[in-house]
């Protein structure tokens, strides 16, 4: 492994985190799979509402996280501002039937980068949860990495 050619990748919330970290750690390449951003908007207010119910966590499609995460996230600039400053190769993938991350979000991320590669996967939803969608993601990701090594 060449430690100078590491690719940072994240899906959904992980895509938001990867996009936010890339300007700081400057990976060789960045792969964003249906990168989330919508969760940032109003995150502290949502946390307040959940805390008022007596819970200190949220369950988002089986991913449980503490409301402390939302409060910490609220301290940061919006996702698109925070993603600025990374100028390496970027791959943005989204399923055409994703109901959590819309095409506009991917387009806003794309505007941050110099020359992103954007593609849409047929079906599979937010988690690319069909064999065909998963295979397409793996194929496009592998091709992107090979092209940028």
Task: Report residues per predicted region.
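Alpha/beta-hydrolase fold nucleophile elbow
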Residues: 1-11
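Gly/Ala-rich beta-loop-alpha elbow adjacent to hydrolase catalytic centers
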Residues: 10-14, 18
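Aromatic pocket-lining residues of Rossmann-like dinucleotide-binding sites
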Residues: 21-22
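Short, hydrophobic alpha-helical segments
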Residues: 145-149
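The alpha/beta-hydrolase serine catalytic core
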Residues: 25-108, 114-120, 125, 131-138, ...
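Hydrophobic aliphatic residue packing
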Residues: 1, 17-18, 31, 101
């Amino acid at each position: 492994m060449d430690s100078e050619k590491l690719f940072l990748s994240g899906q959904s919330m992980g895509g938001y985190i990867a996009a936010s970290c890339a300007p700081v750690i400057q990976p060789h390449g960045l792969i964003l799979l249906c990168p989330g951003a919508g969760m940032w908007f109003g995150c502290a207010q949502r946390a307040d509402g959940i805390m008022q119910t007596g819970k200190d966590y949220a369950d988002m499609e089986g991913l449980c996280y503490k409301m402390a995460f939302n409060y910490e996230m609220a301290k940061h600039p919006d996702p698109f501002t925070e993603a600025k400053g990374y100028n390496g190769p970027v791959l943005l993938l989204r399923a055409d039937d994703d109901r959590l991350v819309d095409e506009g979000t991917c387009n806003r991320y794309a505007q941050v980068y110099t020359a992103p590669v954007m593609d849409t996967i047929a079906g599979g939803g937010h988690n690319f949860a069909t064999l065909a969608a998963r295979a397409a993601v793996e194929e496009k990701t592998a091709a992107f990495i090979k092209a940028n090594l």
